[in-house]
Amino acid sequence: MASFSKVDDNLMQIPPELMQFVKRDTYSLLVKGNSGTGKTTLSLTILRALEIRSNFFYISTRLSPRQLFVNYPWLEKFVVRENIEVNDPSNQRSSLSSFEDARLDEPESLFERITNQLMDVKAPIIIIDSWDAIASFMDTEARLNNERVLQTWRERAGAKLIFTSEDSEDNTLDFLVDGIVELKQKVYRNADIRQIFLAKLRGTKINRSSYIFTLNNGVFKSYNHYDPSEFLITNKRINPLSKRDRSEHKTSSPLDLPSNSSNVKKFTRIICESLSIEFSHEVQENKIVLIEVDPVITPNVCTSFFAKIIAQFLSNDSNIIAQPVPGIEPRLFLDFLQPYLSRKLGKNLRLLHYSKNDTEISEFIDEYGTQDTSSERFKRLKEVVSKVQSQRKNKILMSMLILDDFDNRSDGDSLFSKIIPFLRLNVDLSILVSIKPVRYKELVRNVDMLLRLNLLHNTLLLESIIPDGHSHALSVHRSLGVPAVTLDCLV
């Protein structure tokens, strides 16, 4: 039998209700979905989620066991295989006894091997991928009888039985099995979105009937529904300026940027690649990115997301001018940076804010008046940019600004005639954050990238509108009470 090695469980995640269901001692589960929706990937992920090291029987009617390992490279880290020769039946039977190549098998002989497994091996888990291919050789009466026999033997053996089916309209198994999930793929704003629907999980309470998931890197991963409380900072004892706290609780950075790059094209290219967006080498150097944020998303979520990007540029010794989103004080902003920092904050970070009351971090703040007009704030921005450029020459300059603070409704033209041209000329990478709906179509035509942070089916998504690209799901984990987000491409 195969055995599994240790691996990070965060890479694989199935919905909590389904996880609770598959942990039961015995059950039958039907996984429905059209071709390419992820049935095989989910089945293999369930094996890993249950930490199955032996005593399983995977029947493949579509692919050879060898091809499974080619299509799912991560299996190589879990399943130990020794001296497997595909053309050597004896080796295949001994080394791959857990994976059965049933592409050429007659239904009768295959059905007999399944029942033998149920009778001879105590409490096995059997995955039939797919049941359609086997059942298609049976007439209706024989199929119903065989399905009942499998269920009976499954109960007697205390086994777990998983079927996959590509015919969502076929309901012959529906009343027999204990659980039914269906995988679907839909187009949303030119991007493919995958969902898993929990139709029936006998004995398990279904709190959420559907989840968005991805098959990125051949791994099934679903995403929990949006919960603002996950983005609260609960550990106030961690000091973001403390070298010890930074080294002990540092998490991975979001973008793998080159440490010695002096060309902003490389930075922007890698941002584009991390979001699966096409990057053009013909466009001008300085870039402007507009990120629209759904108003229902809390300031903590926005800050946690932007902190990932800002921290990466800080780690590459770039100059950063950032403006905290409304509702976030400078101290809290620095707290959100904490999971990603690997060294002490230096003079390369400047925060635009209306208050310098926190004396411990006042050195990072450039103050402006609470009653300042957008023109006065723009003037202050130019002063800060000039100061940073004079103090730290030949360094990349990135800015993150709240667009709403510079959008003067009495002088709508200033945004395009003054601010946008200034950023284009003086700032290597400008991120404009809009909490309110963008009022000017002209603005959209003047940016290089348009991203949208919003909720879809109660899941946090980052969409790429300009240029067209894959959507990304946001998930959060915590490092001693501080939230840290990750971005996963939805494919």
Language-model-derived ranges and their functions:
Residues 1-4, 202-262:
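Charged, amphipathic alpha-helical linker segments immediately N-terminal to NTP-binding catalytic cores
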Residues 8-22, 269-283:
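Pre-Walker A adenine-sensing motif
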Residues 19, 32-33, 290-295:
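Residues at the beta-strand->loop junction immediately N-terminal to the Walker
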Residues 24-29, 285-291:
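Pre-Walker A (Motif I) flank of P-loop NTPase domains
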Residues 28-30, 34-94, 296-366:
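Conserved P-loop
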Residues 58, 127-129, 156-166, 322-323, ...:
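Structural recognition of the conserved hydrophobic beta-strand(s) that form the central parallel beta-sheet
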Residues 94-155, 360-425:
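Phosphate-binding/switch loop-helix module in NTP-utilizing enzymes
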Residues 163-217, 429-491:
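Phosphate-binding/switch region of NTP-binding enzymes
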